[in-house]
Regions:
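Feature for exported/extracytoplasmic and membrane-associated proteins, marking the mature portion
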Residues: 1-300, 319, 333-397
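Acidic/histidine-rich, metal-coordinating catalytic segments
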Residues: 307-314
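Conserved H-loop
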Residues: 303
């Protein structure tokens, strides 16, 4: 008997979806899906617009301290890494990574005609589009389309969240979103299928599509759950959300699941009011989670196979506001953490605070050049086909 679309969504039963298991599970017949040295990328999104100037601090810049008389971090408090730059005091693990050659920092990253809306700028970053272009697929999603058309690897991209970000949505392929492998089916399917139902309301093939999608997702859930039990991380992690998410990722990486891209978020960095306390709290969570995660990877000889990237949808304005915070800005910095970096430390110069665009930093590096570098050099795919343009590759990997 054929279910109506509404009945299918309402029941959401494992029994109906199990009809798809035999065909789909052929993807998992071979025990060793991942070759040694499999490269993995972990993206950490700083949601809300992190203040880059109080992240990588221009400790000898008089303009910085003039524009931030209360908010500026003093040279004596910063974790100095070069003559002119220091890290936020809460990022001690990053200072250690820097000293060990496992941290690269790229300043003044952005895009032309920047947008100060959280939602629009995040869409631009996640879709890898120009400011005036509207694209409904993400840069990782298009990687999945290019890399996984007809392939037998349905878990190539995973987001540790209840909702899948635009970044991981392609035209034909999508990543998986979940917070815990044990709860993947119950925690992520409801919102996922609501989205599918909206996209296929008038489609005659809607029910067949839903059957297949649900079967694929539940099969993936079973596979991920079983793989996550093979080599669960035994390391001690802090009791924070980010740390728990990174521990889940560590367990999946060490289980040799075939995932190439992991995606997590931390926030909110929208620090209009009392920025110092809020950013310190978030950076403490970040710092402690990264310390545990990188230590875990090193202990299990996987650190050289993993590249961690951080980004935010925009930076903040150079001047502090009247509420001991900062308002929406433009260009920002990015961190790259890994055991196989080719260009270490500060990749480029600190932002020029004497040459601003109406109080905002001018971008010197297009973020899409960063994506092109990651796609080409780390994920070993055709970046121009995915991004629609040829960007000059950077040298940090």
């Amino acid at each position: 008997m054929l279910f109506k679309r509404r009945e299918f969504i309402q029941t959401g039963s494992l029994a109906t979806a199990s009809l798809m298991f035999p065909k789909f599970l052929k993807a998992f017949e071979h025990k060793n899906l991942v070759p040694p040295g499999n490269k993995v990328m972990v993206v950490i999104q700083f949601s809300g617009g992190n203040d880059g100037l109080n992240t990588v601090i221009p400790i000898n810049n008089d303009i910085y301290y003039k524009e931030r008389p209360r908010l500026g971090i003093q040279k004596a408090d910063a974790l100095q890494i070069t003559t002119d730059a220091g890290l936020n005091p809460a990022l001690s693990a990053f200072r250690e990574l820097y000293d060990n050659g496992n941290l690269s920092i790229l300043n003044s990253v952005g895009y032309p005609n920047p947008d100060r809306s959280h939602f629009r700028s995040m869409d631009i970053w996640q879709s890898a589009s120009n400011a005036n272009d509207y694209i409904n697929t993400g840069w990782v999603g298009r990687y999945l389309d290019a890399q996984c058309s007809g392939c037998d690897k349905p878990t190539q991209a995973v987001e540790i969240d209840d909702m899948l970000s635009l970044a991981l949505k392609g035209n034909k392929q999508k990543g998986l979103a979940f917070t815990d492998p044990r709860r993947l089916y119950s925690s992520s399917n409801e919102s996922f299928y609501k989205e599918i139902s909206k996209e296929h309301v008038n489609s005659e093939a809607a029910v067949d599509y839903l059957y297949k999608t649900m079967g694929d997702t539940i099969s993936s859930a079973n596979y991920i759950f079983e793989q996550s039990k093979l080599r669960p991380s035994s390391a001690s992690y802090p009791s924070t959300k980010l740390a728990a998410n990174l521990k889940t990722i560590a367990s999946l990486i060490m289980s040799d699941i075939n995932t190439k891209v992991y995606y997590v978020s931390l926030g909110s960095f929208d620090t209009h009011i009392n920025q110092a306390a809020q950013q310190t709290r978030l950076f403490t969570e970040l710092n402690d989670a990264i310390k545990a995660f990188t230590g875990d990877l090193k202990k299990n000889n996987r650190f050289e196979d993993v590249l961690i990237m951080t980004f935010s949808e925009f930076g903040r304005r150079v001047s502090q506001n009247a509420s001991n915070g900062t308002d929406h800005g433009t260009a920002n910095n990015m961190f790259f953490i890994g055991g196989d970096l080719k260009q270490k430390g500060l990749i480029n110069t600190m932002p020029n605070l004497a040459d601003l665009n109406s109080g905002d930093l001018k971008h010197q590096v297009d973020f899409k050049a960063v994506y092109a570098t990651l796609l080409n050099k780390w994920l070993q795919t055709d970046d121009e086909a995915i991004l629609g343009k040829n960007y000059q590759h950077l040298d940090f990997i």
